[in-house]
Amino acid sequence: MNNHQHPASLITSPASRRGFIRGGSALSAVAVALLAGKDVMAQGMKGDTSKDVDILNVALGLEHEAINAYQLGAGSGLLQKPVMDVAVQFQGHHKTHRDALVATIRKLGGQPVAEMKLDEYAKALNAGALKSQGDVLDLAARLELGATNAYLSVIPALGDRELAKVAARLAADETMHYTVLTSALGRPLPPGALSFGA
């Protein structure tokens, strides 16, 4: 992947998300230590950071996508005030995730993938088809579920409990977002246990 490009197909296609999930298991302890803010811990570690940068850039692409999806929803005029407030809050969570990923990529010597223009996300996400608040919430729920599963995929590769906790916290945010959105849509929650990350 070219770190300066951010093709819409990379972040919006299910195949790319599956690739991130498969590749995520190779995320090194160095990258996760930096993502966790454990710079001192990372200094003594060795690892191939180029693969880590690629994996983290895909995660960053997902965060860029989520931030812009919420922006499209907020600017659509379709959201009622209470829903708008929650959307802005969730967008803030994604901005925090983005900032952590950008800092980690830079600490690894990589170039963070650039955010596309809002109209590029609008096209990639088919924002023109959004005709109701339900449509906006459905789009957000689908993206949050994809992000949940992507973040959960990296946890098994982590041997250190503190490092696994970082990935779990990211996944927890995405799961919370998905659950709130699903509930707002009036849909039943997943009927079975262990329904995320499978």
Residue ranges: model-predicted function:
Residues N2-I11, S25-A29, L35-A198:
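All-alpha RGS (Regulator of G-protein Signaling) helical domain and cognate RGS-like helical scaffolds
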